[in-house]
Amino acid sequence: MTAPGHGLESLERRGLMFVLSSPSGAGKTTLSRLLIERVAGLKMSVSATTRTKRPGEEDGRDYYFVDHARFQAMTENAELLEWANVFDNCYGTPRAPVEAALAVGQDVLFDIDWQGTQQLREKARDDVVSVFILPPSAADLEKRLHTRAQDSDEVIRGRMSRASHELSHFAEYDYIVVNHDIDEAFAEVHSILKAERLKRERRTGLTAFVRDLQKQLER
């Protein structure tokens, strides 16, 4: 039974933005899927985009589908936490649903590149926890890209070239995980999330809780 005064409910916390980045083929997408499937209190960030909706996609679940004029207005009105132009289509993270989730203690998972991470950090540094996923070797990364059988050899060469540039930003991240084995990598990433959830500064009612404990001890 909880004693009178500030109880366990006062240990509520603010949510966090949990960012995973990696070169293509290093395991970021798989790890994101496993986190969403296995970890309570974590939801995937939903991006706004100007690209055309594909069959089977649902507005608000897969993306927020908007036209170019609306997207431009969102950027001008600071409604996006981060955004980028990719092959003439714009993608960005709406600020309002993320901030609403954080306010009630829900964590939001981001599967974005170093540029998006940089923008998030500039706008909300205290809420961002970033993890960069590394492959164990260049040979292993290339093998994974070929195993996916999604791209031509030319596209794979391009991805390998971009990977070198992406790796140059590893020091901008809070944590580094080398994905030798997907289960081990998941365990490490999950451990990071669990530890970050327990940080003192995210426990919004902790001061009141401790003061109440002190009063109880002094009676």
Swiss-Prot record:
Domain of life: Bacteria
Class of enzymatic activity (EC top level): transferase
Positions bound to ATP: 22-29
Record Pfam families: Guanylate_kin
InterPro entries in the cross-refs: GK/Ca_channel_bsu, Guanylate_kin-like_dom, Guanylate_kinase, Guanylate_kinase_CS, P-loop_NTPase
Enzyme Commission number(s) of this protein: 2.7.4.8
Domain Guanylate kinase-like as annotated: residue spans: 15-194
The keyword Cytoplasm is assigned to this record: yes
GO molecular function, one term: guanylate kinase activity
One GO cellular component term: cytosol
Key words of the record: ATP-binding, Cytoplasm, Kinase, Nucleotide-binding, Transferase
Family annotation (CDD domains): GMPK
Keyword Phosphoprotein: no
Subcellular location: Cytoplasm
Substrates-to-products reaction catalysed: GMP + ATP = GDP + ADP
Principal localisation: cytoplasm
Disulfide bonds: none
Family recorded in the similarity comment: Belongs to the guanylate kinase family.
Known role: Essential for recycling GMP and indirectly, cGMP.
Protein name (Swiss-Prot/TrEMBL): Guanylate kinase
Organism name: Rhodopseudomonas palustris (strain BisB18)
Gene that encodes the chain: gmk
